[in-house]
């Protein structure tokens, strides 16, 4: 009887092609031992051959660095949004390729931001869209696994609600209080407390990542059988200052505490209003005025490992050392000045109230 590994590698042309790609990148020494360990894990858990193959695809893509997606079959699935996109199939699973945005000053780093942001979320245990860096016909892309399957519909937060809520859409300007009201009012949500917790935990991670574009259209729910479940986190291309393309400017910012602080305390702001205005992540979190936010901070902050995040950044071979240092600098300062500061302040208040 053949093992799962022998079944997968022997019978599946796509798997064999991924093996060839990984070997061409001199990853055989890493891939081999890791794959056997992965096989033993899945067999112990009694996974099927299909589950093994799908897992193996992720295993190889994560270790193969920049992949060339040019020759993968098209999925012929259309995607909206402002960025150029192409749908492809990897081992019969649909992926969306997002292209690097062009500006008069060069290419934006939205693809790298998408990749880093998604992987940070996954490091922290959030359900998040799988992403892989690569190229397509010579252009830089990030491959994002499509999590919309048959019978499942994505419903953005902007569109969630009962008819009674929809009638009041203009009233809801998506302040924090309004978000709470909307979530509590929607009786189709399967677990309202969990959804509320997840939203505020996502906000904490977005604060670390300096996400300037989390809005009611790029987070929401999966609808199946008329029930709503929180969707995986996706659309992280606005993290970590993707418009910053000038390395001389990066160096100036890193050498100037005032410039760093502007990018910590003042911008980017979140897209959700606080007291009628766009809110600074620092203002909202450090105010400690939202109990749900405080609980999210306690839940998320202790699990943030900057060392692992920096290792992830160091493995990206399409950005310079200056650019990597810029990412690390901004993450370090946002971690210390927004999250750690607020966490210490919160725990101090809790101790005083004991």
Per-segment meaning from a language model:
Residues 215-216:
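Canonical protein kinase catalytic loop motif
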